[in-house]
Amino acid sequence: IKSSAASDVYKRQVLLDKEYKPDYNIGFPAKRITTQLEWEDMVLDYQVATELEEINVWISSGKTVMEDWGLSRILKAGYRSLFYGPPGTGKTLAATLLGKKNEIDVYRIDLSMIVSKYIGETEKNLAKVFDLAENRNWILFFDEADALFGKRTSTNTSNDRHANQEVAYLLQRIEDFPGMVILATNLRSNIDEAFSRRFQSVS
């Protein structure tokens, strides 16, 4: 069994190792997703194709825009996109192919292991993902994101306040994340308006 000090050293090494590809486990509730298909295999309407090309441009040129052009002083790093549509319309495939086209790993967050009924646990579970991902060039894909990013409730009970605290925490972590975050939902109207205002693209 690792000592506490040894465990802390191991955690620091993992956090700093940019080539580290974690396996799906209780300590990292996300799974790397891949596909044998290619970008050209997707069938897209003009608007969606345009939105995805804009994302491609950001992935390939975002670092140059933010750092070389000095825009990091006035713009937050990172890119946030909402994919919506009925099941089977290609939301997961689009996210996976964005990663494949740009040689970036895509991790699908397992919300069943993230969301907890115990106060503070959902935030801790999210922190595990964001802490590991923030120094790596990953795409984080939240499928069926309504479970975490749905409309907030009025604060009539302690449970309501707890739920809204989770939303506030999520907003902060997503805004501070320097990489790509994709939220997927079956219905666009299910996503809280506070999140919707923070998306650079909606497809």
Predicted regions mapped to residue ranges:
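Hydrophobic transmembrane signal anchors and adjacent membrane-proximal interface regions, especially
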Residues: 9, 14, 106-108
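Conserved ASCE P-loop NTPase core motifs with emphasis on AAA+ ATPases
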Residues: 12-42, 46, 53-56, 146
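Single conserved hydrophobic/aromatic residue that forms the stacking wall/gate
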Residues: 1-6, 10
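Walker A/P-loop NTP-binding motif of AAA+ ATPase domains
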Residues: 1, 46-203
